[in-house]
From Swiss-Prot:
<dbReference type="GO" id="GO:0004359">
    <property type="term" value="F:glutaminase activity"/>
</dbReference>
<comment type="subunit">
    <text>Homotetramer.</text>
</comment>
<dbReference type="Pfam" id="PF04960">
    <property type="entry name" value="Glutaminase"/>
</dbReference>
<comment type="similarity">
    <text>Belongs to the glutaminase family.</text>
</comment>
<feature type="binding site">
    <location>
        <position position="263"/>
    </location>
    <ligand>
        <name>substrate</name>
    </ligand>
</feature>
<feature type="binding site">
    <location>
        <position position="143"/>
    </location>
    <ligand>
        <name>substrate</name>
    </ligand>
</feature>
<feature type="binding site">
    <location>
        <position position="281"/>
    </location>
    <ligand>
        <name>substrate</name>
    </ligand>
</feature>
<dbReference type="InterPro" id="IPR012338">
    <property type="entry name" value="Beta-lactam/transpept-like"/>
</dbReference>
<keyword id="KW-0378">Hydrolase</keyword>
<feature type="binding site">
    <location>
        <position position="195"/>
    </location>
    <ligand>
        <name>substrate</name>
    </ligand>
</feature>
<dbReference type="GO" id="GO:0006541">
    <property type="term" value="P:glutamine metabolic process"/>
</dbReference>
<feature type="binding site">
    <location>
        <position position="218"/>
    </location>
    <ligand>
        <name>substrate</name>
    </ligand>
</feature>
<feature type="binding site">
    <location>
        <position position="92"/>
    </location>
    <ligand>
        <name>substrate</name>
    </ligand>
</feature>
<dbReference type="InterPro" id="IPR015868">
    <property type="entry name" value="Glutaminase"/>
</dbReference>
<protein>
    <recommendedName>
        <fullName>Glutaminase</fullName>
        <ecNumber>3.5.1.2</ecNumber>
    </recommendedName>
</protein>
Length: 327
């Protein structure tokens, strides 16, 4: 049925970050402004080949030329480009932080009863994958895993659950995210049949109690919005966790990102580059880069490739990977 005769989807190998073929370590502060500018121009040209998502009307109407980049570490910004005051929704970039929230509040032993930690080679919204796995989500970076986790945020209502998560995230990361009600209305205007099927299958198999509550909470979380400074602070929280967050908890989240943060291309990309990433269909990539000082890459550019990952941010990461292989 797709997972093997003797396979148990709940058998989870306790994770560490998988090792890339050659760990990319570089001093990004040594890169000249001229080199950054050359890479940014080339990446933005590649983005002309991407497409805007059509299944969320408001995202299909954004300016495909929008671009913003911050790369830096706990000591500050190394390089900045584009319009960093642009606002955008997190969409699937919220997933690592939902995973972090659940691990922080519930712990791994509870969480592994609800979601798995294996990569998937099917699309992020695959109902077929969930059916093959008996309703047990493959990992927390695909829609089934995130919808499942959203169903377990404390709160009696959708609004209370979203507010509980948002308050925690803004406080912990010291950012100023907000719920974009116009985008949420746009999401509701064109219901997603795959996500609906996923939510009902999760409920039928007992992984969530209420399909509607889980799905609508997930929709609100995806519509949390901010600017590049907020995205950078979220990355800093993963790279340099401060109490009460535990380093082993953020390490577990980053290990999942390495396996599944870019969906089908995740493991191959990580093994080639050493970069740990999470993308969102709004045009975001948040990446954790190994360096003498743990580095954060936060980039916004709306056009997507066929897998649903933003073209320009991926191109920039490829340029950085090539740089690190030579230095």
């Amino acid at each position: 049925m797709g997972i093997g005769v003797n396979s148990d989807p709940k058998v989870v190998h306790h994770q560490s970050i998988p090792k890339p073929n050659a760990m990319a370590i570089a001093n990004y502060r040594a890169i000249t402004t001229k080199q950054w500018q050359t890479w940014v121009e080339a990446a933005r040209l590649q983005a002309l080949n991407g497409k805007l998502p059509q299944y969320i009307p408001q995202l299909s109407l954004v300016d495909p030329g929008n671009f913003a980049l911050d790369i830096g570490d706990q000591n500050g910004i190394i390089y900045e480009a584009g319009d960093t005051d642009l606002t955008f929704s997190l969409m699937s970039v919220v997933k690592p932080f939902l995973w972090l929230y659940i691990l922080h509040h519930r712990g791994w032993q509870w969480a592994e009863q609800k979601v798995g930690d294996r990569p998937s080679h099917l699309p992020f919204n695959s109902v077929e994958q969930l059916e093959q796995d008996g309703g047990y989500p493959r990992n927390t970076m695909v829609n089934s895993g995130a919808i499942c986790l959203a169903g377990h945020i404390p709160g009696a209502t959708i609004e209370q659950r979203c507010e509980n998560f948002l308050t925690w995230l803004n406080h912990t990361a010291q950012c100023q995210l907000w719920l974009d009600q116009e985008l949420l209305a746009s999401v509701h205007s064109l219901p997603n049949p795959r996500n609906l099927a996923i939510a009902h299958l999760l409920a039928a198999k007992g992984y969530v109690e209420d399909a509607t509550l889980a799905l609508e909470t997930y929709n609100q979380l995806c519509c949390l919005s901010g600017c590049l400074k907020d995205l950078f602070k979220l990355g800093l929280m993963l790279q340099c966790p401060q109490p009460p967050l535990q380093p082993d908890t953020t390490a577990r989240v980053k290990a999942t990102m390495a396996k599944a943060g870019l969906y089908e291309m995740s493991e191959a990309f990580f093994r080639r580059t050493g970069f740990i990433c999470k993308s969102g269909v709004s045009g975001l990539i948040l990446a954790c880069l190994p360096a003498p000082s743990p580095t954060i890459f936060a980039c916004y550019s709306p056009p997507l490739n066929e897998e649903g990952n933003p073209v320009a941010p991926l191109a920039l990461l490829e340029f950085l990977a090539e740089f690190t292989s030579r230095n």
